Structure formats: C-alpha cells, structure tokens
Swiss-Prot record:
Protein name in UniProt: Acetyl-CoA decarbonylase/synthase complex subunit epsilon
SUPFAM superfamilies on file: DHS-like NAD/FAD-binding domain
Subunit structure: Heterotetramer of two alpha and two epsilon subunits. The ACDS complex is made up of alpha, epsilon, beta, gamma and delta subunits with a probable stoichiometry of (alpha(2)epsilon(2))(4)-beta(8)-(gamma(1)delta(1))(8).
Record pathway: One-carbon metabolism; methanogenesis from acetate
Gene3D superfamilies: TPP-binding domain
Transmembrane segments: none
GO-annotated biological processes: methanogenesis, from acetate
The organism of origin for this protein: Methanococcoides burtonii (strain DSM 6242 / NBRC 107633 / OCM 468 / ACE-M)
Keywords: Methanogenesis
Recorded family membership: Belongs to the CdhB family.
InterPro entries for the chain: CdhB (IPR003704), DHS-like_NAD/FAD-binding_dom (IPR029035)
Length: 171
C-alpha cells in the first residue's frame, strides 16, 4: 500500500475548510461509488507518458466522462478516449450553476476528479467550487491541493504512479 498522506501537514487559520488527505484505495472506492462523476484532465498529463497512460486507464476502467482542459485533448483523442474540450475556468463556472446539465446533458455532477494540472492553477479553480457549489472534489495530483475536498499528499513522481496504480485497482 502506498502511503500518500504520510508527512502531510495542513496549516490553516480558524474557520478554514481545508482538504483531507486521502489514500489511493479510498479515493478509488469513492470514485466508484459516485453517482455522477466527472474526470477533469489537464495538460500536464502530456509531459509524462506514464501519467497519460494512467489517466486513460482511470477514465476507461471507471467509465468516467472526461473534460479535457488545456491541450490535453490531443493525448486523449489519440488513445480513443471520448473527451470533451472545455476551458477549466468556464467549466468551474458551469459546475457552480445548479441548472447546468453537464457536458452530456444528463444532469449535474456530484463528484469531480482532477489530474494533470498546475497546483497554483487548479487550487484556485477548486477554491471557487468549494465556496459556491456542493460538489465533492478529489485531487489525485502529485501535490497536495488545499481547496479540494480530498487530495493526495505531496509525493514524488514515482510514488504518484504507484498511487495511481493502487487507485485503478480499487475502481
């Protein structure tokens, strides 16, 4: 078992709602139990072939709808993933709207899973979602994402791949 929450320190002032550190097996089970999940993939998956491979495996094994942000669309389409392109800021605005019917028109999402984004970028996007929506967010990034509902801790690239493998095994 990969311990991705070891040595994770959460610093916040009084009243701050911060992300809970989560183990990969728990994250995998939560994704499986979500009624209407959305996998939001960023362009950083293209910088590492192993990360791209794991993101495709997660999407296919859990049968997740995929929102491709940045230029991540190219890597996903080449591998046969049915992804929809959308700007991450526009997506965050839509996700806060209770009347939005989703990328496929089947209704609002209840859980989002994020992978392949810059920490400083996705943390700000999730800040808005945390404050203005009831969505659960699971950050399976290499860095701890403070504004997600749950997040992996700060881990090395090798441990991150191991954690994603464990998550995939629990989908």
């Amino acid at each position: 078992m990969v311990d991705v929450i070891k040595n994770t320190q959460i610093h916040c002032t009084y009243g701050c709602k911060s992300s809970k550190a989560v183990q990969p097996d728990v994250a995998g089970k939560m994704i499986s139990k979500a009624k209407r999940p959305l996998f939001i993939v960023g362009s950083q998956i293209l910088k590492d072939e192993e990360l791209l491979k794991r993101s495709i495996e997660i999407a296919k094994k859990a049968d997740l709808p995929v929102a491709a942000t940045g230029h991540s669309m190219s890597g996903l389409v080449d591998q046969g993933v049915n992804a929809k392109y959308i700007n991450v800021h526009a997506l965050a605005t839509y996700l806060c709207d209770p009347n939005w019917t989703g990328l496929d028109g089947k209704g609002q999402y209840d859980t989002i899973i994020v992978l392949g984004h810059f920490k400083y970028y996705i943390d700000q996007v999730l800040s808005g979602l945390k404050s203005f929506s009831k969505l659960k967010s699971i950050a399976i990034e290499r860095e701890y994402i403070q504004n997600a509902t749950m997040s992996f801790g700060n881990i090395t690239p090798a441990v991150h791949i191991e954690a994603l493998d464990e998550l995939i095994d629990n989908l």
